[in-house]
Amino acid sequence: MSKQQKILFIDRDGTLIVEPPVDFQVDRLDKLKLEPFVIPSLLSLQDAGYRLVMVTNQDGLGTDSYPQEDFDAPHNMMMEIFESQGVKFDDVLICPHFEKDNCSCRKPKLGLVKEYLQAGKVDFQNSFVIGDRQTDLQLAENMAIRGIQYNPETMGWKQILKDLTVKARVAEVVRTTKETDIKVFVNLDEQGGNAISTGLGFFDHMLDQIATHGGFQMVCKVEGDLHIDDHHTVEDTALALGQALKEALGDKRGIGRFGFSLPMDECLAQCALDLSGRPYLKFDAQFSREQVGDLSTEMVVHFFRSLTDTLACTLHLSSAGNNDHHIIESLFKAFGRTLRQAIKVEGTELPSSKGVL
């Protein structure tokens, strides 16, 4: 095992398998029962890059009160079931002592996991102890990692999987210059509740088109030097929005990455997008008017160029039609619809053969 791995140190009885409520020993095959959804959850956690280590106290294992052969039959069956379904444990760490023995390996003491800690194998920010007892949480504290208390009703395997693999894709960017004061918030996994105020009514409407057709939430508050013109307001808003989208995407693991969309309204709007990590814009649209509403038409291409710079994406965007209002709107709608495809989470893999985006 390489250094600094994401490791889940998982309790056995009451967490992976049901703990008998009377004698607390799984010492016969007919007492073996898996906890709900444990196998599909562990498989998904493995796919997300977690290594699995079982850590369990087995009171008096190997004594008359708990003969080794009584333990082995159901335990080996459990391991065979896990392995047959693709669940692989790097280690199975067992303390066989009674609490009164005052050994160094019984949870929550560190004896069982000492090698992992001393060898630098644990990614302390992204490793967890999962178990149903307070001693499991104490073990986590002693290891200086986080603990999750398993409960089939309130914190079952489905919820644990969600908590460990679904990270909130949100970001807030504050950008302040001599010309503008901007705050942009995006939540890529929520829709509705958009609140956009730039001082430019038509521009507000266009930004709302991106969020609405992109399927995400945007809150954008801008104060700019509109007494001069709209240049700084549009440019800096694009820079802040692109940065917010990039930060919300994180490492881009699991996203679609690519998107393509056409047409929009009566205009033929075409958009192709790659969240490649490399800024590039190819833009093709002609306007017959200098302004639509309070937005300068020359700022449309400048908006998308600034956005691609901070989002770090490759964008091909074009539209043709007879009405400038509809042409501009089709560009923003097409971009939003294409972005929706590209940011959608489809799995857990990074969509790049290079291993980084």
From Swiss-Prot:
<dbReference type="GO" id="GO:0005737">
    <property type="term" value="C:cytoplasm"/>
</dbReference>
<dbReference type="InterPro" id="IPR020565">
    <property type="entry name" value="ImidazoleglycerP_deHydtase_CS"/>
</dbReference>
<feature type="binding site">
    <location>
        <position position="11"/>
    </location>
    <ligand>
        <name>Mg(2+)</name>
    </ligand>
</feature>
<dbReference type="InterPro" id="IPR023214">
    <property type="entry name" value="HAD_sf"/>
</dbReference>
<dbReference type="InterPro" id="IPR020568">
    <property type="entry name" value="Ribosomal_Su5_D2-typ_SF"/>
</dbReference>
<keyword id="KW-0456">Lyase</keyword>
<keyword id="KW-0963">Cytoplasm</keyword>
<dbReference type="InterPro" id="IPR005954">
    <property type="entry name" value="HisB_N"/>
</dbReference>
<feature type="binding site">
    <location>
        <position position="103"/>
    </location>
    <ligand>
        <name>Zn(2+)</name>
    </ligand>
</feature>
<dbReference type="InterPro" id="IPR013954">
    <property type="entry name" value="PNK3P"/>
</dbReference>
<dbReference type="GO" id="GO:0004424">
    <property type="term" value="F:imidazoleglycerol-phosphate dehydratase activity"/>
</dbReference>
<dbReference type="InterPro" id="IPR020566">
    <property type="entry name" value="His_synth_bifunc_HisB"/>
</dbReference>
<dbReference type="GO" id="GO:0046872">
    <property type="term" value="F:metal ion binding"/>
</dbReference>
<feature type="region of interest" description="Histidinol-phosphatase">
    <location>
        <begin position="1"/>
        <end position="168"/>
    </location>
</feature>
<dbReference type="Pfam" id="PF00475">
    <property type="entry name" value="IGPD"/>
</dbReference>
<keyword id="KW-0479">Metal-binding</keyword>
<feature type="binding site">
    <location>
        <position position="13"/>
    </location>
    <ligand>
        <name>Mg(2+)</name>
    </ligand>
</feature>
<dbReference type="GO" id="GO:0004401">
    <property type="term" value="F:histidinol-phosphatase activity"/>
</dbReference>
<dbReference type="InterPro" id="IPR036412">
    <property type="entry name" value="HAD-like_sf"/>
</dbReference>
<feature type="binding site">
    <location>
        <position position="97"/>
    </location>
    <ligand>
        <name>Zn(2+)</name>
    </ligand>
</feature>
<keyword id="KW-0511">Multifunctional enzyme</keyword>
<dbReference type="InterPro" id="IPR006549">
    <property type="entry name" value="HAD-SF_hydro_IIIA"/>
</dbReference>
<feature type="binding site">
    <location>
        <position position="132"/>
    </location>
    <ligand>
        <name>Mg(2+)</name>
    </ligand>
</feature>
<keyword id="KW-0368">Histidine biosynthesis</keyword>
<feature type="active site" description="Proton donor">
    <location>
        <position position="13"/>
    </location>
</feature>
<keyword id="KW-0028">Amino-acid biosynthesis</keyword>
<feature type="binding site">
    <location>
        <position position="95"/>
    </location>
    <ligand>
        <name>Zn(2+)</name>
    </ligand>
</feature>
<comment type="similarity">
    <text>In the N-terminal section; belongs to the histidinol-phosphatase family.</text>
</comment>
<dbReference type="InterPro" id="IPR038494">
    <property type="entry name" value="IGPD_sf"/>
</dbReference>
<comment type="pathway">
    <text>Amino-acid biosynthesis; L-histidine biosynthesis; L-histidine from 5-phospho-alpha-D-ribose 1-diphosphate: step 8/9.</text>
</comment>
<feature type="active site" description="Nucleophile">
    <location>
        <position position="11"/>
    </location>
</feature>
<keyword id="KW-0862">Zinc</keyword>
<comment type="pathway">
    <text>Amino-acid biosynthesis; L-histidine biosynthesis; L-histidine from 5-phospho-alpha-D-ribose 1-diphosphate: step 6/9.</text>
</comment>
<feature type="binding site">
    <location>
        <position position="105"/>
    </location>
    <ligand>
        <name>Zn(2+)</name>
    </ligand>
</feature>
<dbReference type="GO" id="GO:0000105">
    <property type="term" value="P:L-histidine biosynthetic process"/>
</dbReference>
<dbReference type="Pfam" id="PF08645">
    <property type="entry name" value="PNK3P"/>
</dbReference>
<dbReference type="InterPro" id="IPR000807">
    <property type="entry name" value="ImidazoleglycerolP_deHydtase"/>
</dbReference>
<dbReference type="InterPro" id="IPR006543">
    <property type="entry name" value="Histidinol-phos"/>
</dbReference>
<protein>
    <recommendedName>
        <fullName>Histidine biosynthesis bifunctional protein HisB</fullName>
        <ecNumber>3.1.3.15</ecNumber>
        <ecNumber>4.2.1.19</ecNumber>
    </recommendedName>
</protein>
<comment type="similarity">
    <text>In the C-terminal section; belongs to the imidazoleglycerol-phosphate dehydratase family.</text>
</comment>
<keyword id="KW-0378">Hydrolase</keyword>
<feature type="region of interest" description="Imidazoleglycerol-phosphate dehydratase">
    <location>
        <begin position="169"/>
        <end position="357"/>
    </location>
</feature>
